[in-house]
């Protein structure tokens, strides 16, 4: 009798995705972040569900209900700290996952990559509406500033903002709908994650050398399932350590003050994981231009597969593009630093230079370096009969 996991309609799906999945032997720890993101999502949904049982989405009691969770609910302080810091770890894993995709050419699986960019936008929206819920000063003013950006949309901008607010300012209606969105979006993210995996398993994973690995694959379980479990352990140890020893390290002190529409905080800034995009937004003195730059800073990822000029998939054997990749990483770190600083000289100029470099690297320098490396290698690639395979040989006497 055939094994049940291979014949049962439901178990067969799980088996093909988690047990008998053919996996390249050479994939490194950089391929762990997909499963770590799955762990983060599950942890966020579970902790969020328990928080939602005690939270009240009303401006008069929201702040008090969060205090009540931390003071009176059994282990409420731990659940709240795990949820708040879990968001930070979620974004750390997201950015490392995207970085790995850029470095190793995973973006050439266009459907998987584009679904991933949609997932990034959904995760960012979820984190933004979630940050508003404690109804502290930074929650209120962050919501006011960011939603106000939509007023830059021509003709319908003001109407759009009032529609999102549910009135003429950020008020009770805004908080209620943001709570509804924050509860809904994680399940939408879970659905898109399944689609993301569906497209990934159509092609299989890439590998560090960027070559076709059909001839050298092993089952996902037990080899990579145990490797993923090690990643789970490291992530959970780091998350629990941060939540227990320095739970407010990544938060904003202003959020310990209840929201007051009459007092503006001296520096309005989002959570650390949005600072790079916030710096790009602030670097353009025009409101509409800033909003477009903010959107472009994320949506530019969708252009990466189109702008791929190299005959090699991965950056493993492309030293010049490697240099530009790490320059991009440094640039994003600089943007994150600038996003948390006040709008004054010299930070404004540094932010503008870093923002220009961010787009210049994606749109011009990295595609140019791929083209130059092709010229340097003098490769002529001949398409084989299989469309996804390419046999490459150096030009002789060229």
Swiss-Prot record:
- Transmembrane ranges? 33-53, 77-98, 113-133, 178-198, 226-246, 288-308, 320-340, 347-367
Q: Which residues bind a ubiquinone?
A: 201
Q: List the disulfide bonds.
A: none
Summary of the function given for this chain in its UniProt record: Component of the ubiquinol-cytochrome c reductase complex (complex III or cytochrome b-c1 complex) that is part of the mitochondrial respiratory chain. The b-c1 complex mediates electron transfer from ubiquinol to cytochrome c. Contributes to the generation of a proton gradient across the mitochondrial membrane that is then used for ATP synthesis.
Other remarks on record? Heme 1 (or BL or b562) is low-potential and absorbs at about 562 nm, and heme 2 (or BH or b566) is high-potential and absorbs at about 566 nm.
Which InterPro entries would you find in this protein's record?
Answer: Cyt_b/b6_C, Cyt_b/b6_C_sf, Cyt_b/b6_N, Cytb/b6-like_sf, Cytochrome_b, Cytochrome_b_C_euk/bac, Cytochrome_b_N_euk/bac, Di-haem_cyt_TM
Q: Give the protein's recorded name.
A: Cytochrome b
Q: Which family does it belong to?
A: Belongs to the cytochrome b family.
Organismal lineage: Eukaryota, Metazoa, Chordata, Craniata, Vertebrata
Q: Where does heme b b562 bind?
A: 83, 182
What does this protein's record comment on cofactor binding?
Binds 2 heme b groups non-covalently.
Q: Tell me how this protein sits in the membrane.
A: Multi-pass membrane protein
Q: Which residues make up the binding site for heme b b566?
A: 97, 196
> Any idea which UniProt keywords this protein has?
Electron transport, Heme, Iron, Membrane, Metal-binding, Mitochondrion, Mitochondrion inner membrane, Respiratory chain, Transmembrane, Transmembrane helix, Transport, Ubiquinone
Protein source organism: Channa asiatica
Q: Can you say where in the cell this protein is located?
A: Mitochondrion inner membrane
Description of how the protein assembles with itself and partners: The cytochrome bc1 complex contains 3 respiratory subunits (MT-CYB, CYC1 and UQCRFS1), 2 core proteins (UQCRC1 and UQCRC2) and probably 6 low-molecular weight proteins.
Task: Name the Gene Ontology biological process terms.
Answer: mitochondrial electron transport, ubiquinol to cytochrome c
> Cofactors per UniProt?
heme b
What Pfam families does the record point to? Cytochrom_B_C, Cytochrome_B
Q: Would you name any one GO CC term?
A: mitochondrial inner membrane
Q: Name one GO molecular function term.
A: ubiquinol-cytochrome-c reductase activity
